[in-house]
């Protein structure tokens, strides 16, 4: 059990056999008769239940819902399978009406293009970040990263030149550029990984190699933060623009997360590997608890890291929340939406 973040804002539970309960104004984590951890509700923003075999009392759930503290349940691989949130967060009707209407006009197309270009720019900057100290120490790797970043920049610039009236008119072209960018990005990252690991490239669900397992787990933690930001902005997490709608698929969350995957999770995971931090999977292709603890701590610390945004330095979690609010403002025709581009 651990409290993570700069101000101990996130409680992470990842030990089988533990139970989360409420005592006065604190959440308490017990295993058998032992008290493992306490978290004051006053400072808490989120609870992550990161494995099976962990129980949560109804009193603890009620206290979190009353205070707007989101509880997210993750599989061992980091896939979010349930959220407990306050129903009051879904009460902004005007924003949701405009969000749905925007799909069939240029607002929807603008957002789809913005999410995709933001993703490509941030992938390019992640490669630049990994290359910036290698120009003299490892010139070949520097050139690999530089060329990859240039290629991603070219794709992003080409995306920005597409014109149309609705997202359905251009979705195939957008996804083509995004897919080409993904191939280039992951191929380049493979060459920049400084440790010997069995990694053939990016896999999502069902991955059993350590790199993809770490990425998937990190994305799961980020996903919970993005969904919370989307809901707090009054948006419907299931009505997206870039990702195709399917029953049970949170398309808008998957749209918004694209700008943040590379600067948050990719930077953490490849940083850990290249620093020699021990990460491994067990015989069943699962991340053991100690690796999940390391990843959760690193991702949440990264979200507390500060980046330049709107002419000031802000925590990444604050930037994420502001982007969601800018998105809500945009669909209501009250302001622009620009992608967050992380520095390097």
Segments predicted by a language model, with ranges:
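Short low-complexity, flexible loop/linker segments enriched in glycine and/or proline
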Residues: 86-90
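Extracellular/luminal Protease-associated
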Residues: 41-55
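Short Asp/Glu-rich motifs
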Residues: 83-84, 249
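NTP/phosphate- and nucleic-acid-binding module
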Residues: 26-28
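Short hydrophobic alpha-helical runs that function as membrane-insertion/retention elements
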Residues: 47-49, 69-75
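A short acidic, amphipathic alpha-helical/loop segment
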Residues: 59-63
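Short gly/pro/ser/thr-enriched loop/turn and capping motifs at secondary-structure boundaries
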Residues: 77-83
């Amino acid at each position: 059990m651990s409290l993570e973040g700069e101000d101990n804002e996130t409680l992470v539970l990842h030990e089988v056999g533990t139970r989360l309960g409420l005592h006065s104004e604190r959440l308490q984590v017990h295993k058998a008769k032992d008290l493992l951890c306490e978290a004051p509700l006053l400072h808490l923003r989120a609870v992550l239940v990161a494995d099976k075999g962990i129980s949560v009392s109804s009193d603890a759930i009620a206290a979190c819902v009353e205070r707007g503290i989101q509880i997210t349940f993750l599989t061992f691989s980091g896939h979010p399978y349930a959220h407990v949130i306050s129903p009051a967060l879904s009460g902004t009707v005007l924003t949701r009406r405009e969000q749905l209407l925007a799909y069939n006009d240029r607002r929807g197309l603008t957002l789809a293009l913005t999410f995709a270009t933001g993703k490509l720019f941030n992938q390019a900057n992640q490669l630049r970040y990994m290359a910036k100290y290698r120009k003299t120490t490892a010139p070949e790797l520097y050139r690999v990263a530089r060329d990859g970043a240039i290629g991603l920049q070219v794709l992003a610039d080409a995306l920005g030149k597409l014109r149309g009236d609705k997202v359905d008119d251009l979705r195939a072209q957008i996804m083509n550029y995004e897919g080409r960018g993904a191939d280039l990005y992951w191929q380049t990252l493979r060459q920049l990984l400084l440790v010997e690991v069995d990694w053939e490239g990016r896999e999502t669900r069902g991955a059993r190699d350590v790199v993809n397992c770490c990425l998937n787990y990190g994305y799961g933690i980020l996903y919970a933060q993005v969904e919370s930001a989307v809901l707090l902005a009054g948006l419907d997490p299931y009505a997206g623009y870039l990702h195709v709608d399917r029953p049970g698929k949170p398309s808008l969350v998957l749209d918004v997360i694209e700008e943040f995957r590379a600067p948050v999770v990719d930077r953490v995971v490849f940083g850990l590997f290249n620093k020699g931090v021990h990460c491994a999977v067990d015989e069943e292709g699962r991340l053991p608890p100690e690796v999940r603890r390391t990843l959760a701590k690193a991702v949440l610390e990264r979200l507390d890291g500060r980046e330049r945004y709107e002419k000031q330095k802000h925590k990444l979690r604050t930037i994420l929340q502001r982007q969601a609010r800018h998105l809500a403002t945009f669909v209501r025709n009250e302001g622009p939406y620009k992608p967050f581009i992380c520095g390097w």
